[in-house]
Swiss-Prot record:
Catalytic activity: [protein]-peptidylproline (omega=180) = [protein]-peptidylproline (omega=0)
Any one Gene Ontology molecular-function term assigned to this protein's record: peptidyl-prolyl cis-trans isomerase activity
EC numbers for this chain: 5.2.1.8
Pfam families the UniProt entry points to: FKBP_C, Trigger_C, Trigger_N
Species name: Rhodopseudomonas palustris (strain BisB5)
Residue stretches making up the PPIase FKBP-type domain: 171-256
InterPro entries, per database record: PPIase_dom_sf, PPIase_FKBP_dom, Trig_fac, Trigger_fac_C, Trigger_fac_C_sf, Trigger_fac_ribosome-bd_bac, Trigger_fac_ribosome-bd_sf, Trigger_fact/SurA_dom_sf
Localization per record: Cytoplasm
Protein name: Trigger factor
Superkingdom per UniProt: Bacteria
Amino acid sequence: MQVKETVADGLKREFEVNVPAADIDAQVDARLVDLKDKVKLNGFRPGKVPVSHLKRVYGRSVAAETIDKLVRETNDGIFAERGFRLATEPKITMPQDQKVVEDILAGKSDLNYTVAIEVVPTIELADFKSFSVEKPVVDVGDSDVDEAIKRIAEANRAYADKAEGAKAETGDRVTVSFKGTIDGVAFDGGTGEDIPVVIGSGSFIPGFEDQLAGIGVGETRTIKVSFPANYASDTLAGKPAEFETTATKVEAPQDVTIDDEFAKTLGMESLDKLKEAARARLGAEYAGATRLRVKRQLLDRLDETHKFDAPPSLVEQEFEVMWRSINAEMQQNGKSFADEDTTEEAAREEYRKIADRRVRLGLVLSEIGEKNKIQVTDDEVSRAVIERARQMPGREKEVWDFYRSNNEALAQLRAPIYEDKVVDYILELANVTEKKVTREELYKDDDADKTAA
């Protein structure tokens, strides 16, 4: 067998490989001998079928299987001998001429093929003990807890019927039935029965709630609005509509007394227990935000200290996934690049940079995990599946079965667990200092954190 490297351009490599016909024929014969004791043919006793006869019957299919196996093993040897880690699947170009193919399968001609690959670069890891990371910490104060309780009370506020003849005001809850039309024609989703609307809540199409002010029970109004340009339905976005609306109930919000009785309506033993629960929830919320900020710092530091050319094909794959998502989101929201004060060309350039960063950081994290034998256990994956199932009450078995039968979905669950374990490993070595900050400071530039690799 002969191997000749024909391309060595950056991370791209290409090889021409020659496998002598004699080597292929020898492996085919060995495979046929192995089959001799297993094949049953009419007219022959078990194990007594001549290899020459087997070759006439099965030679072509065995040769095809042998060549496929030989190509895979040869390629693996080429890559292993040179210490290559592949960024993508190798691109193999086999002979296309039918006569040449038949001669190869018949053992009359050598096999000549090319294999093109893109390799992962050698990554020199930084000294993580030199990393300095600032950990923002927010104490959960009594005022934070009180504000959280107030929000809970507002969300659970009771309403009571207003006096007969009373009109609806901002803050009141009006129960309405309506039928919507566009240019006099009813449309899907435009009809509602006994729908509660809190005036001023902003939960309906802009302008709808405002026009309910002053309405009374039994009164019918024609409410004229326009669907927002970024409305989820393309058929409705930006169009004017009329809703023939009848109020069936007008209720005023009732004062909420935040005490033990209120806490009991929420299933808590007392107000103190409700405050404990609110404090714990806020603590978990702040801890999650702190984790994101620390992780962003760490990823930025890894980006700064690991500069290398990422495999172009991986960058292109990452970019295409991001670009499809961005375009789908913009289309759904009725936005254009001009609305975002940019151009498509500038946006493409920016997202290619982000894709390059994500690929490089992914390779760095993988290298760290591999060199330090960091692994995700089956128990950790199972816990992640269970947590996902809990988020879909009533469909737990469906979720569990989905992940058990879908390796790709399991890999998507495994990836963030692996990344977090690598991050924790680095943080154990880095110099981490805590800094007290306010809630506002903790959540500053939160959007930037969301785009971190």
